[in-house]
């Protein structure tokens, strides 16, 4: 029996769809299986929904004040924006590109040959790619299932996109969990006129971030009206009439809706992975550095493998892996993924102002390296920030004494764009001095790099100056030691 396809991709995620487009561009025969049970079938770009909400919250607040009451308009705007993002990868357009798009539930089978069985149709291919992504964990909170809650999967469907239908937006929210999406959404909802309570089990919000930056974000949220419980555990949840009660110790919080911001779990159910010899754990599918599973014809990428970036699941990382997996599945010459290099991929938390980082945080670097310099610059002295009246924020750049950049953390209006400069510098192994060899636009936020380099030069100048004072003393000490050895020998 001949092979029907070169590559069969399983998953409705944005990464699965981009992988299908990548494969068809390589002249491959491609089938894309969109599982019916996947929430990503309706919203493959769901990760961008809170960001779209945040954008409309910012543009509706020219004076940076809270809206007095929540409106359904921002939600409908965000839904429309997501719909536009999803148009280029809709099933109809994918089919027009020559991709066989099949909606349904299926599983792998190994007899008489390896195939993917969907509605009794056996799809045979040279290789298979699993990019099903992840879904929300079921929170282990007494009463939560009976009371009801919202996750990122369900958030776009909370308010539909019908502009003519009047809908009520929940006014009081409890957000439970320490994932970055919870912090982002808490701030956005507060700006949209909602009363928000953020509950995290950790000692700080954004536990993977530098404490100074996390504290600055926390102060910003509290200034905007978000009530934050740190190191708190929700003991139970119950419903009373139209109100939901969240119990934290002796405190009882009355809300209209609960959002769960816990880490997702890999979507692995019903694919018969054990039957075809694909190893996996509760954290995800086991893969090697070529994104190949324990079955040589089956590849996997993204959050279904449990891969994270900066402590969080990342759509950009998933898309990066999807391209490599497609090329490895179709070519004999394999590209290896350097998992250590994941530490040098940029990451951002889209609060206002946003936080971005790459490489090591200052806390991590101090624990693992010696002779470090933490270069710190505040944007309140940056001309562009002053002209834009957006002076909140600062940056930390972790460098060695030789100038090698180990990591950077930035919090300011343009942090996601600025971090790209330092990410490329780390990847290309440039020093902080190398970054000053080309002129920087002025005024611009990027001027902080020049200022950081000046700080590094000042440190070395002062250090060398201090060393000069002690050089004669060191010479006398060495001479005394030599004389002592000579006398002892005689």
Regions found by a protein language model. Name each.
Residues 8-10, 106, 114, 122-133, ...:
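Short hydrophobic core segments
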Residues 170-174, 180-240, 249, 311-319, ...:
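Rossmann-like dinucleotide-binding cores of NAD(P)H-dependent redox enzymes
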Residues 18-22, 301-364, 441-464:
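A conserved FAD-binding loop/helix module that cradles the flavin
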Residues 10-18, 22-50, 55, 352-358, ...:
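Flexible, glycine-rich terminal cap/loop adjacent to redox cofactors
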Residues 147-169, 257-331:
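FAD-site-proximal beta/loop scaffold in flavoenzymes
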Residues 3-32, 174-175, 179-192:
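N-terminal Rossmann-like FAD-binding beta1-loop-alpha1 element of flavoenzymes
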Residues 3-5, 118-127, 169, 248-257, ...:
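Core beta-strand elements of the Rossmann-like FAD/NAD(P) dinucleotide-binding domain
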């Amino acid at each position: 029996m001949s092979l029907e396809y070169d590559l069969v991709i399983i998953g409705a995620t944005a990464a699965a769809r981009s992988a299908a487009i990548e494969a068809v561009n390589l002249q491959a025969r491609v089938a894309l299986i969109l599982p019916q049970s996947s929430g990503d079938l309706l919203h493959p770009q769901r990760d961008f929904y809170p960001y779209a909400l945040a954008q409309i919250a910012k543009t509706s607040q020219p004076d940076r004040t809270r809206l007095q009451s929540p409106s359904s308009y921002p939600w409908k705007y965000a839904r429309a924006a997501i719909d536009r993002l999803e148009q280029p990868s809709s099933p109809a357009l994918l089919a027009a590109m020559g991709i066989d798009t099949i909606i349904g539930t299926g599983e792998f089978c190994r007899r008489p040959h390896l195939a993917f069985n969907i509605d009794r149709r056996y799809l045979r291919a040279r290789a298979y790619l699993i990019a099903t992504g992840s879904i929300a964990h079921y929170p282990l909170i007494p009463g939560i299932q009976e009371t009801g809650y919202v996750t990122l999967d369900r958030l776009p469907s909370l308010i539909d996109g019908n502009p003519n239908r009047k809908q009520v937006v929940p006014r009081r929210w409890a957000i439970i969990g320490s994932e970055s999406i919870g912090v982002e959404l808490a701030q956005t909802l507060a700006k949209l006129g909602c009363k928000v309570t953020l509950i995290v089990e950790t000692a700080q919000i954004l536990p993977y971030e530098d404490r100074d930056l996390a504290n600055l974000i926390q102060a910003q949220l509290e200034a905007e009206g978000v009530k934050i419980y740190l190191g708190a555990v929700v003991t139970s949840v119950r419903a009373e009439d139209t109100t939901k009660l969240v119990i934290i110790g002796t405190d009882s919080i009355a809300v209209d809706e609960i959002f769960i911001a816990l880490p997702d779990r890999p979507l692995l159910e019903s694919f018969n992975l054990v039957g075809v010899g694909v190893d996996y754990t509760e954290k995800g599918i086991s893969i090697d550095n070529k994104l190949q599973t324990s079955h040589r014809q089956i590849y996997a990428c993204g959050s279904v493998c449990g891969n994270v970036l900066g402590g969080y699941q990342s759509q950009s990382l998933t898309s990066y892996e999807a391209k490599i997996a497609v090329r490895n599945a179709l070519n004999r010459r394999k590209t290896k993924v350097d998992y250590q290099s994941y530490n040098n991929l940029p990451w951002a938390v889209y609060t206002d102002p946003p936080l971005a980082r790459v490489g090591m945080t200052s806390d991590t670097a101090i624990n693992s390296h010696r002779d470090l310099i933490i270069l710190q610059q505040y944007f309140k002295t940056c001309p562009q920030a002053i002209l834009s009246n957006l002076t909140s924020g600062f940056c930390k750049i972790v460098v060695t004494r030789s100038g090698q950049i180990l990591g950077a953390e930035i919090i300011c209006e343009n942090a996601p764009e600025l971090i790209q400069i330092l990410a490329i510098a780390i990847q290309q192994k440039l020093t902080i001095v190398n970054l000053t060899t080309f002129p920087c636009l002025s005024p611009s936020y990027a001027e902080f790099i020049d200022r950081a380099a000046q700080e590094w030069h000042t440190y070395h100048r002062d250090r060398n100056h201090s060393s000069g004072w002690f050089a004669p003393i060191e010479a006398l000490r060495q001479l005394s030691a030599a004389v002592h050895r000579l006398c002892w020998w005689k």
